[in-house]
């Protein structure tokens, strides 16, 4: 009997408030006691953009080890910023959440050879049927992994290199574990050296007793792959330790460039990396230049896919974030509904691809009456509408794109506007409605 426990295709208690478009599918896999199968349960949540006719790829946002990380991973597929990337390229967004408590060995799942690669593929097969998009089962992947998620991604790279568009290793890889003999050393196939990848530890991890392995593991993985000519980069985060910080502001442009470069117009066979557009940089510096003019050793240099990512990289290694000079697009589908003497506003909006979504400003008759959230808080990075956790995921409760104006005069006529504010504070044009 299949271990897939099929959930409702629409997870109403989570999805209904978001008003961000798309649909959510969820499937749970029960733990197994069979040899070679996953001994932990896992929930996979998939988001599909509205109007997608052919799913070109799957962007996987994989959390790290421990109960807190697993809980953080529950909201990954609901992230409006990562959804904007997926929507641009006709991709699905997948957020796994393993059912691991703090007493259980993380390697039960973060080493995919212990069964998590099988459940991952089973979930994709299920989603392909449930969504009536058979191409999901064979679509290529972008793999983002934090800590144990990076461990998982680095081994998946050796198992399914032909399926992987690009990889982002945030503070994690399996290299140290296989070098120490703690796990079986994988055989790295030649195809693994053709995948664009970026290693991204926190600079404060380097001399940290607990997290130093995240630094050495990612840096040594970078050197191993770069020595073989792989398109690999290294970008330390100057502000952080093991938390993800504002790394998304470089990870998303990196994936954006790789998706544009490698996704085919049809089919699942990936296009090769275009090395003519590459920029290179000496590792642990803050200067990059076109590969054609680079004077250092290219086999030791940081590889960057194009000029835009190179400029973002140069900023990030100095500041831990990336700036944005373009305002977001306006919200849409603003609807006004009278409710018990008040006026309910609902709308939809996409996150700004460059810097995400910080807040909404509500205006009535040309005057600001509210902000959502009232005060955005950034505990681990820039303040965002959905919050930002240690794990680069939205924080619960997930906010609604909804406002109830209780101060309006009943029966009066008013014009309302909603303005989106992106992650750096730039405002969109107004979305307006009158009643």
Tell what function each PLM region has.
Residues 18-58, 89, 141-156, 160, ...:
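A domain-start/cap signature at the N-terminus of enzymes
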Residues 165-249:
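The feature captures the conserved acid-bearing segment of alpha/beta-hydrolase catalytic domains
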Residues 87, 93-118:
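Cap/lid segment of the alpha/beta-hydrolase catalytic domain
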Residues 228-230, 237-334:
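Alpha/beta-hydrolase-fold serine-hydrolase catalytic core, especially in secreted/extracellular enzymes
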Residues 405-426:
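Beta-strand-rich modules
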Residues 359-411:
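Recognizes extended acidic, P/S/T-rich segments that occur
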Residues 108-135:
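Alpha/beta-hydrolase active-site loop
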Residues 317-356, 410, 425-435:
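Pro/Thr/Ser/Gly-rich low-complexity, intrinsically disordered linker/stalk tracts
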């Amino acid at each position: 009997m299949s271990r897939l426990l099929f959930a409702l295709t629409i997870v109403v208690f989570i999805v209904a408030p978001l008003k961000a478009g798309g649909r959510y599918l969820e499937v749970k896999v029960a733990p197994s006691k069979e040899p070679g199968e996953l001994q932990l349960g896992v929930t996979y949540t998939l988001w599909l953009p509205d109007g997608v006719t052919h799913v070109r790829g799957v962007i996987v946002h994989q959390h790290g080890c421990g109960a807190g990380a697993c809980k953080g991973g529950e909201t990954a597929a609901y992230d409006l910023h990562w959804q904007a990337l997926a929507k641009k390229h006709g991709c699905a967004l997948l957020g796994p959440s393993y059912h691991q408590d703090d007493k259980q060995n993380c390697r039960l799942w973060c080493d995919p050879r212990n069964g998590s690669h099988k459940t991952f593929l089973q979930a994709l097969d299920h989603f392909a049927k449930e969504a009536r998009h058979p191409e999901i089962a064979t679509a290529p992947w972008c793999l983002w992994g934090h800590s144990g998620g990076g461990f998982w991604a680095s081994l998946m790279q050796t198992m399914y290199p032909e399926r992987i568009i690009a990889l982002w290793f945030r503070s994690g890889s399996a290299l140290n574990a296989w070098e120490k003999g703690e796990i079986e050393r994988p055989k790295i196939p030649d195809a693994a050296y053709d995948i664009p990848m970026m290693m991204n530890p926190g600079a404060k991890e380097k001399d940290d007793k607990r997290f130093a392995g995240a630094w050495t593991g990612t840096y040594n993985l970078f050197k191993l792959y770069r020595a073989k000519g792989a398109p690999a980069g290294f970008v330390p985060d100057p502000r952080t330790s093991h938390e993800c910080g504002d790394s998304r502001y470089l990870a998303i442009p990196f994936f954006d460039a790789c998706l544009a470069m490698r996704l085919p117009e049809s089919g699942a066979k990936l296009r090769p990396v275009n090395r003519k557009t590459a920029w290179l940089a000496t590792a642990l510096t803050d200067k990059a230049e076109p590969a054609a003019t680079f004077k250092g050793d290219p086999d030791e240099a940081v590889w960057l896919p194009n000029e835009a990512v190179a400029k973002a990289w140069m900023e990030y290694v100095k500041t831990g974030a990336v700036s944005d000079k373009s305002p977001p697009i306006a919200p849409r589908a603003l609807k006004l509904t009278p409710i018990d003497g008040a006026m309910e506003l609902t709308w939809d909006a996409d996150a700004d691809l460059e810097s995400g979504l910080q807040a909404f400003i509500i205006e009535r008759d040309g005057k600001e009456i509210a902000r959502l959230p009232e005060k955005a808080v950034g505990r681990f990075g820039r303040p965002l509408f959905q919050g930002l956790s240690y794990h680069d995921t939205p924080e619960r409760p997930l906010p609604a794109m909804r406002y109830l104006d209780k101060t309006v005069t009943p029966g009066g006529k008013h014009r309302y506007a909603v303005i989106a504010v992106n992650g750096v504070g730039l405002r969109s044009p107004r979305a307006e409605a009158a009643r």
